[in-house]
């Protein structure tokens, strides 16, 4: 029995109904449903017998059933009791226990003595749509004796005419008074809840009672749409599953009382326990003078579920009453029993699994009927997966909603109880909610899309998304995304995000992170960052940033500001307003910016600074104390980085936004060390000219491993006929020509990338004898060199014009063999074109330099010829000096362009080696095999250098690829005399050492005419 409700509470309940939109209009029940039963498709139709009636004077419902395959008989259905009772005569061979049990009917006081036994119950006039009968394996009560008002001494149930009860109790929640001693009322002994498939879970245990029959097994078709549902509470302390009687209220002549409401098909009248509220207003009942009844004219209303949304009203003795009106209204104890007649106006659902009863008005607009679909919740509601409903919800008492994954409520919430959302999944509320007792999100997530009039608490680990308006104070210890309005104060120890508004004050001991990435949190009152709290200010695209906007003051007390750039942020020097406060900012943040100002940070060369003023707090991106050179790994990178740090203009804006790795890559491209490496390449390629001049001298001297190709001889008398082919060793004036070429690369080191190059060209010369032993000559020519920096976007070429003089002599007839001296001096004019590209994050440039260079070289060689029976040998020693001058350059291009003054390079080469040649016959042709092996040593300037400047920077020096200090020199050649006037010569020259490879090849065909 509940306490009598006061008028203010009833007024509140009426207001709740208005908020829910509950009315008697037929439109209120259209398309209202839930998907609780969508996964079930099977139900059993159980027909009533012809003796069934809902007439007030003799209402009762009967079905045909057999037990243990016996004769089917008629049983009365009773929602006011539990358990199936059959007389002993239906199981004549059944042996009763010596310890009889008792089952009593509380409304009438009738009872039976007998024994419980498990039997097969078959409803013989039933069908599941596939021809199957409704069958249950369940405990039934076999009555040996029956006691009622007509037989107070009891009768034996051994014969069919004994008058013993044939009853199937399908109710729940009746008190256990009169039962025992070993059995209590339980859902376990209800045959309608244990039909085939129900215990296995494939059929939803429950039933629908209509005026035409019973649907056993709940589906979306018979119970999913149009009903008002009231949640039941489990029976406390029960040893077997059961539900408590439905909560409700009754109003008599304007006086309301909350009370359990029992829909009892075993009773033809109504009773109500009103205590003293109608004292002096009761009269003897017309049909039974021993009962007290409400007198004619008494106004009675019965409501299910704690609201006035579902119920019926009648006037005792009235003429315009609904079909639900009972034969008479008895005034007695024990709550409210509607009797069977309520089923004349309502279809009734019992869900034994979920713990719900449902009501569907047969004529919602009929006289005295109040009906609008809704869900009245109280206690624990464990929703199935993907639960969804558009039923309005009334929270009749403190409730806990749980969902395994997600749930959606499309209609309004009201009620007097508190609502706890216990996850672990997420629940979406799409309509208004009015819950003065408050909402607690203890786990999982909740999304509010409309107006929520309730204080709200969010526990740690839970999350809330507010897309509407919350009218009430919020306490958040979890994650709260406010993209609507909180009309109240907000106390935060969790994390607050979103782009919403708080009309009151924001007090935070947790985190504030406006927006969803970059956004604004607006607070109309004051903002207080308490000790231990933090503000995550994100920087976004287009100069945007997070903003906390306050209509009052912002107080900061030992709080931390975390600065976090987003992926869309374009780094650079800029200012951002991160707090706007009408009353200014009091206090300072400890600033933490892990993305800035450290070598391993994404932006090592940038840092943050804050400035508070009367308008708020400004965040500035400034240059950090990390020098560019702090991230470099090579000398060239360091040189360029140091120079760029010295420049107040130029590339700084592009470089300060880089991380360490990108900066190193930039500093590897920016130094322009291709300009240094080209110098080394040109010095290396000068050896081609020395080699050609030295080779002509050796040929003229008949030296070892010299080419045997003829030259053009010229007689001094000047006659035209005096021009003729002559052997290479001719004493007269000789005109000669040779082609040369090479390709190779100089491998890079940790400081500079390697360079590859190729050269092709020719020389034309003339020489003559001078005195008895000397021969001198003059030569000139042209060559073309191209080069590429390996794995770098740098390349170029050089056009080269050559002029040289050479001379030598031999000392023959010495006891130890012939000695030969060979010397020369040459100069090369070079026109160099160098192109490079620079590309790193946020910057690209194409650069070109064009400049002149000149190479002066001198060489001398001594050779000692030794003839043996096998071959001719010549040990030799060669010394060369190379001086390179370039005229300086200024690159065309952008901010990465370099300028350099003229510079020079002086390099010496010494070579010790051995040449060998041998005559041979190849396929009957005369041939000469020749070869050379030696060791070359470089000294002086072997690492080319370039001193350059960027615009506005200090000068810096970078190193190119070094010339190999030690290298092996190899040559091999073959001359074949193909005929009297034809000679074919081929030769290979190579140089290997210290990462340097150079290969040369030439071929010549000489035909004498």
Where do the model's predicted regions map?
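Outer-membrane translocation/initiation segment of Type V secreted surface proteins
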Residues: 6-14, 18, 367-384, 545, ...
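Sec/Tat signal peptide C-region and signal peptidase I cleavage site
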Residues: 22-28
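Pepsin/retropepsin-fold aspartyl endopeptidases
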Residues: 28-376
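Aromatic-anchored, glycine/proline-accented short structural segments
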Residues: 230-285, 523-524, 869-931
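Extracellular repeat-rich scaffold modules on cell surfaces
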Residues: 365-376, 387-479, 485-486, 490-491, ...
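Outer membrane beta-barrel translocator domains of Type V secretion systems
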Residues: 654-868, 985-1009
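Outer membrane beta-barrel transmembrane domains
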Residues: 809, 813, 856, 876, ...
